[in-house]
Amino acid sequence: MTAFVILHYRAIDTTRSCVRSIRALTGDKHIVIVDNASPDGTGKQLAEEFAASPDVTVLLHGKNDGFARGNNVGVRWVCAHLDADFTVVLNNDVEIPQHDFIPQIARIYAQNPFDLLGPDIVSVFSGIHQSPKTLHGCTLESVRHKRACVARSKNPILLLLSSGEKNSPAIWRLVQIRNRKKQHIDTT
């Protein structure tokens, strides 16, 4: 099963579109919407709307802790309550057009086991790949090593998963965390 964590803040129609695109995917899935303390009541609206949906859980987070912590709320919930093979963290403005997205993740994992998987960002205007390339899969150990190097560095590294092209289908901002052993990376 694949879990999808969506961070929600005020844009209810955008979140609904994201949920619709995930529901259209082939494969077993569960959607976790984390409302980041929307002041307009849209989080409560979503909770009521999906209350009878066994494939959607809405978490009403009491305060807006920002992007990373809000997503961590959802990832921690997945680790505690679901036996997911993969957890996909994405923005609520993302729609996934590939119906075989979930089997694609499983195929990639079977070919090259990974702990984190990011997108291949391709500009829709130029066709240029804007993603950093790596020759080997990313493991938790390599992430820990890089994190330790960054912690010792005087110049921290910031990774942005966006090409800056609004509404680009190539910008699906996927970060996948394997939680088979209930491991997670705390970005707080």
Could you describe each region identified by the protein language model?
Residues 61-81:
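Glycine-rich, basic loop-to-helix element that forms the pyrophosphate-binding segment
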Residues 6-17, 37:
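Active-site beta-to-alpha loop of glycosyltransferases that engages the nucleotide-sugar donor
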Residues 35-44, 63, 95:
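A conserved acidic beta->alpha catalytic loop
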Residues 95-132, 138-141:
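Conserved donor NDP-sugar-binding/catalytic core segment of glycosyltransferases
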Residues 14, 40-49:
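Acidic helix N-cap motif at the loop->helix transition within catalytic regions
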Residues 20-29:
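Short, acidic, metal-binding catalytic loop of nucleotide-sugar glycosyltransferases
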Residues 82-95:
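Short beta-strand-to-loop acidic/aromatic patch adjacent to the donor-nucleotide binding site
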Residues 28-37, 57-61:
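Short beta-strand/loop segment that forms part of the nucleotide-sugar
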